[in-house]
């Protein structure tokens, strides 16, 4: 892919009050000096769905193909995209226990978005002082508190 593509950093986090229960996500996009924050709410969801939707929201906000560094504290999202997804596809969307892959709708949505960009996936430990991850966590928790549905 071309080096002329803009480099965008996306940070995302999901949260759930109960699992399942009301959930939210927070996403921060940074391109140079520009920063954009997104959040969303779902009244009945799971933590993993919110983690996926945080990444999806960030990628959906991009208006043209970009080089993307996507950072999340979700091993589920990070390993899902870097280690597991191709095996799931080969096995007809079955996991290692031969069960249907959870959240297939969101994984497929994420795959379509990733195909438009050059994405590298990065994991950070949650609640460990990573400024952007902490901000995304604040946005996700505020979305739950507000019950807002700005993106979902």
UniProtKB/Swiss-Prot annotation:
Keywords: Cytoplasm, Endonuclease, Hydrolase, Magnesium, Metal-binding, Nuclease. Its cofactor is Mg(2+). It catalyses: Endonucleolytic cleavage to 5'-phosphomonoester. It is an enzyme of class 3 (hydrolase). Coiled coil: none annotated. It is found in: Cytoplasm. GO terms for molecular function: magnesium ion binding; nucleic acid binding; RNA-DNA hybrid ribonuclease activity. Mg(2+) 2 binds at residues 13, 137. One of its GO terms (biological process) is DNA replication, removal of RNA primer. GO terms for cellular component: cytoplasm. InterPro entries: RNase_H (IPR050092), RNaseH-like_sf (IPR012337), RNaseH_domain (IPR002156), RNaseH_sf (IPR036397), RNaseHI (IPR022892). The keyword DNA-binding does not apply. Its EC number is 3.1.26.4. Residues 4-145 form the RNase H type-1 domain. Binds 1 Mg(2+) ion per subunit. May bind a second metal ion at a regulatory site, or after substrate binding. Mg(2+) 1 binds at residues 13, 51, 73. The keyword Glycosyltransferase does not apply. Disulfide bonds: none annotated. NCBIfam families: PRK00203.1. Monomer. This is Ribonuclease H. It comes from Syntrophotalea carbinolica (strain DSM 2380 / NBRC 103641 / GraBd1).
């Amino acid at each position: 892919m071309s080096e002329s593509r803009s480099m965008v950093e996306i940070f995302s986090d999901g949260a759930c009050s109960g699992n399942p229960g009301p959930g939210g996500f927070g996403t921060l996009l940074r391109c140079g000096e520009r920063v954009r924050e997104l959040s969303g709410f779902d009244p009945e969801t799971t933590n993993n769905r919110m983690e996926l939707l945080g990444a999806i929201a960030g990628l959906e906000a991009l208006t043209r193909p970009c080089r993307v560094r996507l950072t999340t504290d979700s091993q589920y999202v990070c390993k899902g995209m870097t280690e597991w997804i191709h095996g799931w596809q080969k096995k007809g969307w079955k996991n290692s226990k031969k069960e249907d892959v959870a959240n297939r709708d969101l994984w497929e949505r994420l795959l379509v978005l990733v195909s438009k960009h050059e994405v590298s996936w990065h994991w950070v430990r949650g609640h460990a002082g990573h400024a952007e991850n902490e901000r995304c966590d604040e946005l996700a928790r505020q979305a739950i508190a507000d019950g807002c549905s700005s993106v979902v």
